[in-house]
Amino acid sequence: MLRRVRYLAPALALLILAGCGESGPTPEEQVRTTVAEFGRATAAKDYTALCDRILAPELIEEVESIGLPCERALRQGLGEVEDPRLTIGTIEIDDDKASAEVRTSAAGEEPSRDTLELVNLDGVWKISSLGS
Protein backbone atom coordinates (compact mmCIF):
# COMPACT_ATOMS: atom_id res chain seq x y z
CA MET A 1 0.00 0.00 0.00
CA LEU A 2 2.74 2.51 0.91
CA ARG A 3 4.54 1.63 -2.30
CA ARG A 4 1.51 2.72 -4.37
CA VAL A 5 1.25 5.97 -2.41
CA ARG A 6 4.93 6.63 -3.05
CA TYR A 7 4.36 6.35 -6.81
CA LEU A 8 1.20 8.44 -6.74
CA ALA A 9 2.71 11.29 -4.72
CA PRO A 10 4.76 12.80 -7.61
CA ALA A 11 1.77 12.57 -9.95
CA LEU A 12 -0.47 14.30 -7.41
CA ALA A 13 2.13 17.02 -6.87
CA LEU A 14 2.24 17.67 -10.63
CA LEU A 15 -1.55 17.91 -10.80
CA ILE A 16 -1.63 20.35 -7.91
CA LEU A 17 1.10 22.50 -9.45
CA ALA A 18 -0.66 22.50 -12.82
CA GLY A 19 -3.75 23.93 -11.12
CA CYS A 20 -1.69 26.74 -9.59
CA GLY A 21 -0.53 28.15 -12.91
CA GLU A 22 -3.36 30.61 -13.41
CA SER A 23 -2.83 33.03 -16.26
CA GLY A 24 -4.23 36.05 -14.44
CA PRO A 25 -7.53 37.85 -14.75
CA THR A 26 -9.66 37.37 -17.85
CA PRO A 27 -10.25 40.31 -20.20
CA GLU A 28 -13.78 40.64 -18.77
CA GLU A 29 -12.38 40.84 -15.24
CA GLN A 30 -9.85 43.45 -16.38
CA VAL A 31 -12.58 45.56 -18.01
CA ARG A 32 -14.77 45.22 -14.91
CA THR A 33 -11.82 46.37 -12.75
CA THR A 34 -11.19 49.42 -14.96
CA VAL A 35 -14.86 50.43 -14.86
CA ALA A 36 -14.97 49.93 -11.08
CA GLU A 37 -11.83 52.08 -10.71
CA PHE A 38 -13.53 54.73 -12.83
CA GLY A 39 -16.49 54.71 -10.44
CA ARG A 40 -14.27 54.90 -7.36
CA ALA A 41 -12.08 57.68 -8.79
CA THR A 42 -15.14 59.69 -9.82
CA ALA A 43 -16.70 59.34 -6.36
CA ALA A 44 -13.40 60.32 -4.71
CA LYS A 45 -12.92 63.22 -7.14
CA ASP A 46 -9.52 61.72 -7.96
CA TYR A 47 -9.07 63.49 -11.29
CA THR A 48 -5.38 62.59 -11.40
CA ALA A 49 -6.21 58.87 -11.41
CA LEU A 50 -8.87 59.41 -14.06
CA CYS A 51 -6.53 61.31 -16.37
CA ASP A 52 -3.34 59.33 -15.72
CA ARG A 53 -4.58 55.75 -15.46
CA ILE A 54 -8.20 55.26 -16.44
CA LEU A 55 -9.09 57.38 -19.47
CA ALA A 56 -7.74 56.60 -22.95
CA PRO A 57 -5.72 59.29 -24.76
CA GLU A 58 -8.53 59.89 -27.29
CA LEU A 59 -11.00 60.64 -24.48
CA ILE A 60 -8.50 62.87 -22.71
CA GLU A 61 -8.10 64.79 -25.97
CA GLU A 62 -11.88 65.21 -26.15
CA VAL A 63 -12.07 66.34 -22.51
CA GLU A 64 -9.28 68.87 -23.08
CA SER A 65 -11.00 70.29 -26.18
CA ILE A 66 -12.64 72.93 -23.93
CA GLY A 67 -9.21 74.48 -23.48
CA LEU A 68 -8.37 73.14 -20.02
CA PRO A 69 -6.00 70.37 -18.92
CA CYS A 70 -7.74 67.05 -18.26
CA GLU A 71 -7.83 67.30 -14.46
CA ARG A 72 -9.20 70.85 -14.46
CA ALA A 73 -11.78 70.03 -17.13
CA LEU A 74 -13.02 67.03 -15.12
CA ARG A 75 -13.09 69.08 -11.92
CA GLN A 76 -15.18 71.69 -13.72
CA GLY A 77 -17.55 69.09 -15.16
CA LEU A 78 -17.83 66.74 -12.18
CA GLY A 79 -16.94 68.91 -9.20
CA GLU A 80 -20.55 69.64 -8.19
CA VAL A 81 -21.73 66.02 -8.51
CA GLU A 82 -22.54 64.63 -5.07
CA ASP A 83 -22.49 60.97 -4.06
CA PRO A 84 -21.99 59.50 -7.55
CA ARG A 85 -22.62 55.76 -7.83
CA LEU A 86 -21.94 53.34 -10.64
CA THR A 87 -23.26 49.81 -11.07
CA ILE A 88 -21.67 47.59 -13.71
CA GLY A 89 -23.90 45.45 -15.91
CA THR A 90 -23.11 43.45 -19.04
CA ILE A 91 -19.62 43.54 -20.48
CA GLU A 92 -18.88 42.65 -24.10
CA ILE A 93 -15.40 42.22 -25.53
CA ASP A 94 -14.42 42.22 -29.20
CA ASP A 95 -10.66 41.83 -29.63
CA ASP A 96 -9.08 45.04 -28.27
CA LYS A 97 -12.37 46.89 -27.76
CA ALA A 98 -14.99 46.42 -25.07
CA SER A 99 -18.23 47.91 -23.89
CA ALA A 100 -19.69 47.97 -20.40
CA GLU A 101 -23.29 48.74 -19.59
CA VAL A 102 -23.49 50.86 -16.46
CA ARG A 103 -26.16 52.45 -14.34
CA THR A 104 -25.13 55.74 -12.81
CA SER A 105 -26.77 57.88 -10.18
CA ALA A 106 -25.93 60.86 -8.01
CA ALA A 107 -27.65 62.88 -5.30
CA GLY A 108 -30.40 65.03 -6.77
CA GLU A 109 -30.10 63.53 -10.27
CA GLU A 110 -32.12 60.95 -12.16
CA PRO A 111 -30.35 57.59 -12.60
CA SER A 112 -29.27 56.78 -16.14
CA ARG A 113 -28.13 53.77 -18.12
CA ASP A 114 -25.11 54.24 -20.36
CA THR A 115 -22.58 52.21 -22.24
CA LEU A 116 -18.91 52.93 -21.62
CA GLU A 117 -16.52 52.05 -24.44
CA LEU A 118 -13.05 50.76 -23.62
CA VAL A 119 -9.91 50.05 -25.60
CA ASN A 120 -6.98 47.80 -24.75
CA LEU A 121 -3.72 49.76 -25.01
CA ASP A 122 -0.63 47.61 -24.54
CA GLY A 123 -2.48 45.18 -22.27
CA VAL A 124 -4.26 47.84 -20.20
CA TRP A 125 -7.98 48.55 -20.59
CA LYS A 126 -8.83 52.27 -20.67
CA ILE A 127 -12.13 54.08 -21.11
CA SER A 128 -12.38 55.64 -24.57
CA SER A 129 -15.98 56.91 -24.45
CA LEU A 130 -18.17 57.87 -21.50
CA GLY A 131 -21.54 57.02 -22.89
CA SER A 132 -23.58 56.04 -25.84
Where are these regions (language model features)?
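Sequence contexts marking disulfide-bonded cysteines in secreted/extracellular proteins
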Residues: 21, 50-52, 69-73
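Short, well-ordered alpha-helical segments enriched in acidic and aromatic residues
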Residues: 34, 44-61
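Hydrophobic pocket/interface hotspot
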Residues: 38, 50, 118
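C-terminal motif of bacterial Sec signal peptides marking the signal peptidase cleavage site
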Residues: 16-19
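Short, aromatic-enriched amphipathic alpha-helices that serve as compact interaction elements
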Residues: 27-45
